[in-house]
From Swiss-Prot:
GO cellular component, one term: cell outer membrane
This protein's name: Outer membrane protein W
Keyword check for Phosphoprotein: no
Signal peptide: 1-21
Gene3D superfamilies from the UniProt entry: 2.40.160.20
Keywords carried by this UniProt record: Cell outer membrane, Membrane, Signal, Transmembrane, Transmembrane beta strand
Subcellular compartments: Cell outer membrane
Keyword set includes Membrane: yes
Chief location of this protein within or outside the cell: membrane
Record Pfam families: OmpW
Length: 212
C-alpha cells in the first residue's frame, strides 16, 4: 500500500508538471533581436526621385503576453528605438529616421496547455511614433530641411511559434506585418512639401521567454 501511495504521488507530481506557461492566467515575456524590413514607397516629390529606400534595422525586441484562456493571449510588442536611413536613387542616403512601433495583438494559440509546441496567429493594431528625424549633409546640400513624420495608426497581423523547454522557459520565432502609412513633412529650397510615405514593414523576431 505504501509503495502504491508513493507511486501515485509521483504520478500526480509528473502530471502537474506537464502544464506549461501557455495556460489561462499566466504572464510571460520574450526578448530577442527584432528586425524591421520596410516595403517602402512614397508619393509626391520623394516618389519622383528615382526610387525611395528605407534601410532595415535590428534592435532589442520585447513582448509581454497574458493568457486569458489556454488558447487566447493578449500581447504587447515593444522594442528599443529603430534607426533607419532614408534615401532615393537620385540622391543616395539623405536622412535618418527614428521610430517606435508598439503593437497590441489578440492571439490564438493552437494545441493545449500541455503542448510543448504552440503555433499561434494574431491580429491587432500598431501605433508608430517618429522622432529625432534629420537630413544628413547630402540632404542639406540638396536644399532639404525641417524633416518630420506624422505618427501612424494601422492594422497588424502575426504568425509565430513557441517551443516550451519547461514550465518557465521557452524559445520562439514570430513574424509581424504592419500597416504603417505616414506623411513626410519637409522643406525643399525653402518650399514646404507634404509627401505620403508607405513603410508597411515585415518584422522578424527570434526570442527566449520566461514565465512570471
Amino acid at each position: 500500500m505504501k509503495k502504491f501511495t508513493v507511486a501515485a504521488l509521483a504520478l500526480t507530481t509528473l502530471l502537474s508538471g506537464s502544464a506549461f506557461a501557455h495556460e489561462a492566467g499566466e504572464f510571460f515575456m520574450r526578448a530577442g533581436p527584432a528586425t524591421v524590413r520596410p516595403t517602402e514607397g512614397a508619393g509626391g516629390t520623394l516618389g519622383h526621385l528615382n526610387g525611395f529606400d528605407v534601410s532595415n534595422n535590428t534592435q532589442l525586441g520585447l513582448t509581454f503576453t497574458y493568457m486569458a484562456t489556454d488558447n487566447i493571449g493578449v500581447e504587447l510588442l515593444a522594442a528599443t528605438p529603430f534607426r533607419h536611413k532614408v534615401g532615393t536613387g537620385a540622391t543616395g542616403d539623405i536622412a535618418t529616421v527614428h521610430l517606435l512601433p508598439p503593437t497590441l495583438m489578440a492571439q490564438w494559440y493552437f494545441g493545449d496547455s500541455s503542448s510543448k509546441v504552440r503555433p499561434y496567429v494574431g491580429v491587432g493594431v500598431n501605433y508608430t511614433t517618429f522622432f529625432d528625424n534629420d537630413f544628413n549633409d547630402n540632404g542639406k546640400n540638396a536644399g532639404l530641411s525641417d524633416l518630420s513624420f506624422k505618427d501612424s495608426w494601422g492594422a497588424a497581423g502575426q504568425v509565430g511559434v513557441d517551443y516550451l523547454i519547461n514550465r518557465d522557459w521557452l524559445i520562439g520565432a514570430s513574424v509581424w506585418y504592419m500597416d504603417i502609412d505616414t506623411t513626410a513633412n519637409y522643406k525643399m529650397g525653402g518650399v514646404q512639401h507634404h509627401d505620403s510615405v508607405r513603410l508597411d514593414p515585415w518584422v522578424f523576431m527570434f526570442s527566449a521567454g520566461y514565465r512570471f
